[in-house]
Amino acid sequence: MTDTRQLFLERVRQALRMGARPGASQEIEPRGNIGYQGAGTDPAARFCQQFTAAGGQAHPVANRAIAIDKVLELVQAFDAQRILLGSGTFIDALGLRERLKLAGRHVDSADAARDTLFAADVGVSGVDYLVAETGSLVFLARPSEPRSLSLLPPVHIAIASVEQIIPDLFDFFDLASVREDGTPPSCISIITGPSKTGDIELKLVTGVHGPGEIHVILIAE
């Protein structure tokens, strides 16, 4: 055996012995959240910018009274007769059901029969979070606001407060591991703009698998 070959084999043996030792591998310093973008100095403006870029329509308003007026304005603009309305502490406090009925609209709850859900012209809901980085709406599944509320009507109107904005998706996953009752959500929906598909002849089509229009009314207070 030549000296060169013997030296090579000895180095291989040493490397194998070192590799088998616990803790012999070099530790890599943590690099934090790679790709974290955040929201900059104005999370609300950042969200509206990104949401609009994704094809949504943002409507910043000063208070809840103006938010209600904006919902009625949009419903009137779409000539929507049947409204699918979510529920929850935030939405219920707005008194939208009564205002919509006074405007002559038929209002259904999310637990309505299947045929009723498909007949809705507009879906109105709250949100759990808004992600400034991507302009996304986040919904945690619950009986009062199921997926059908934001999926079936051709137009979706979401009402939110600026306090629900989080900077980045990394922040969302830190927050959404459990619900208030201590259990993880059965489903998490992250919606960025209206429904889009481009798998037919490579042409972008909107509104095939969900709402063709999505509006966010963002309350400053």
Sequence positions of predicted segments:
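The feature marks the mature, well-folded catalytic cores of soluble enzymes
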Residues: 1-221
